[in-house]
């Protein structure tokens, strides 16, 4: 966790809680370092540190680690050890659940008694195939004359003979800690301990939750303070909070946070899964709830965690079932009846906070609602670091870059991304892995590492879970695929890419970026293609909305669809919302009588309010495309909604040349094809028409190629002895001029001159209505102002003059 100084005016309590996150400085807090001598019972400290803590060489000390784990060791002085560090080997570290660089605390532990009896068992996977008496071979030499302190529940590794065996201390008598002296009895009867049971104890702690620093501070302040130090609230004279409601999109880590809190506080954790309480017998569901709360009160301090709380506490007026209503009432009375200092805290988690009964959301029941949202870039980096800490990563993996590219991903999506990258790594090694073999070569296992390439492949295959149903393959269209339209490209980059890639520039100049763009122009000029390219070039998420799909037959559902789409876009910001055929849902209001009770009007109103309500914080862009700009409602075209109106004209000669080149980029074209001549000849053709010409020429080439193949086959079958040279050898391997000539016979223009005049008239009226005052200049006294004024007036002048041509941007 980063160590940010809180601003002085923030609440002291908040300050205190982030101080929970940052460790207090204290002489007995030491940083874990790798041991030099590999002894399981010894830790070494610098002599000065030992002096400060009043320890002597050979003292038994108690060390506290993470997840409420502790163990006992013998302290030795070591000059080479740095002062604030403590050296311990891997065994001690795993007992304390810490890694190198973590902080542990050291305490004096003077009254460690000699043990009468200890019960020690081996761990099953380390004793496979070990024959003979374990006690004589391993334990006796390990404990002989060593006076080792042990702690119940610890694991330790003993090296002996050919291999190492891991043991677990099952029971110690008389206390949890004791020293194994020569007269201590050691029992090692019983079945070996299963490794799985051990691993399961290694549950999640605060270190395993990333990207929710602020929320974590709030939760710890609401949960740990009342459970650990109830006297704080008593002395101030307020009641501690009783309930916390966590809400947020699925996969953002609500249940994980609750688990981590339970493990780290050491409180009794009672988990209620919403649907499990239900029972078919009358009154049984309520009694299940009551039992859970009674159990928690008995074992106080405790945390009751209700997962998916919306399933057992829905709004009472909306539910038909009697049982649900009774359960909600029971939950309300139970939460009120929790004695204020019973040290029971109720946590609820849901991803639909608005479907919960409002009576539950008042103060005194769920006092605090905490939004566990989609993490930002720093949060995503934290989550990625947590998920990759046990992965074997190659040198070139750049987690920061990956966290930049994963907009809108929640924790679960990032976990899936890491898994997918690892799978990708395994797939590459599949040729050397034999599934039938019992074991895999250690060499192969060691050579595996997840590289940056694997992460990139995984990024291509995964998408944020918020966008699963409106999933859009981000199209593989780049700027190179689009011929011409240079001005439009630049305008688009400024509108969409700058706010995503340089947000700090907008802050510096104190303006929020513009939100919307409308492309209009004749069909087949690349409006949709441009939207695809911008989605691909700038690493934003892309949701494509087909206008007509929003309308449904149910009353009120069409508007709900619009709301839902905007919610999704906000969740996975930065996001480009692309409305294709905008005219189908944004026709002028008032003239749509008779269609589904004015559904189109209501959808438009919803659209307008959504566009105004888009928070400036979230970078969501709207791109509309239409070829009927004249029928779009004028309220939608005002600045602040779709403020950039971009006319995408028929391509001029240069653009046509570029389009031909872009279309034929991947095709083998003969030398005798003069693309410039084609571009000259296709005056008035749209981009789609030009693509069609290329496709047709390509088709003719393929047809000829296949005919040649058939001819060769026929000859071969008639005359098997014929030499290869006699075959028809002029193989058609490229598109020749003849193919284009043939193709041009069928070429046609899809946009008539009358249509173009309509678009130009519309563009001109816009230009005139907006070009008012285009000759504006500042007073000539200000020398600097004058030049900028001229520059500002320029674009209008040129575009108005060029309006007669078929290309407004010539």
Curated annotation (Swiss-Prot):
GO MF terms held by the record: ATP binding; ATP hydrolysis activity
Entry-linked Pfam families: AAA (PF00004), AAA_lid_3 (PF17862), CDC48_2 (PF02933), CDC48_N (PF02359)
Superkingdom of this protein's organism: Eukaryota
Assigned keywords, A-Z: Acetylation, ATP-binding, Cell cycle, Cell division, Cytoplasm, Cytoskeleton, Nucleotide-binding, Nucleus, Phosphoprotein, Protein transport, Repeat, Transport
Positions of modified residues (Phosphoserine): 41
Binding site for ATP: 248-255, 521-528
Location of N-acetylserine modifications: 2
One of the protein's GO biological processes: cell division
Cellular location(s): Nucleus; Cytoplasm, Cytoskeleton, Phragmoplast
Gene Ontology cellular-component terms listed: cytoskeleton; Golgi apparatus; nucleus; phragmoplast; plant-type cell wall; plasma membrane
InterPro entries documented for this protein: AAA+_ATPase, AAA_ATPase_CDC48, AAA_ATPase_domain, AAA_lid_3, Asp_de-COase-like_dom_sf, ATPase_AAA_core, ATPase_AAA_CS, Cdc48_dom2
Presence of the UniProt keyword Oxidoreductase in the record: no
Broad class of where this protein is predominantly found: nucleus
PANTHER family: AAA-FAMILY ATPASE (PTHR23077), CELL DIVISION CONTROL PROTEIN 48 HOMOLOG E (PTHR23077:SF200)
Known function: Probably functions in cell division and growth processes. Interacts with certain SNAREs as part of specialized membrane fusion events where vesicles from the same organelle fuse (homotypic fusion).
Similarity annotation: Belongs to the AAA ATPase family.
UniProt protein name: Cell division control protein 48 homolog E
Gene name of the encoded protein: CDC48E
